[in-house]
Amino acid sequence: METLTFEFPAGAPARGRALAGCVGSGDLEVLLEPAAGGALSIQVVTSVNGSGPRWQQLFARVFAAPTAPAASIRIHDFGATPGVVRLRLEQALEEAGHD
């Protein structure tokens, strides 16, 4: 198991909380909570050791524009592919944007 942390610039705080995915399904889960301070912080707990560069590249693409909400994201990963990670992130961000 490996724990990774990342931080990116962000805009206004997320409007709500969100949960996407289920780690028990051999996939991953994304937990998102609003945060103050104009920063998006991400913590990844993964079963794949040495995967830090892959996560960094994925997040750099997803959060390249400073339009991401200020939030704290926790990801519990069980070897999900980058496509699934992006899908779950987008689902959580969309859910957090609803009232």
From Swiss-Prot:
A GO term, aspect molecular function: acyl carrier activity
UniProt keyword Nuclease, yes or no: no
Modification O-(phosphoribosyl dephospho-coenzyme A)serine, positions: S25
PTM info: Covalently binds the prosthetic group of malonate decarboxylase.
Record-linked InterPro entries: Mal_deCO2ase/Cit_lyase_ACP, Malonate_deCO2ase_dsu
Top-level taxon in the UniProt lineage: Bacteria
Swiss-Prot/TrEMBL keywords: Cytoplasm, Phosphoprotein
Cellular compartments annotated: Cytoplasm
Gene Ontology CC: cytoplasm
Family indicated by similarity: Belongs to the MdcC family.
Known function: Subunit of malonate decarboxylase, it is an acyl carrier protein to which acetyl and malonyl thioester residues are bound via a 2'-(5''-phosphoribosyl)-3'-dephospho-CoA prosthetic group and turn over during the catalytic mechanism.
Protein name: Malonate decarboxylase acyl carrier protein
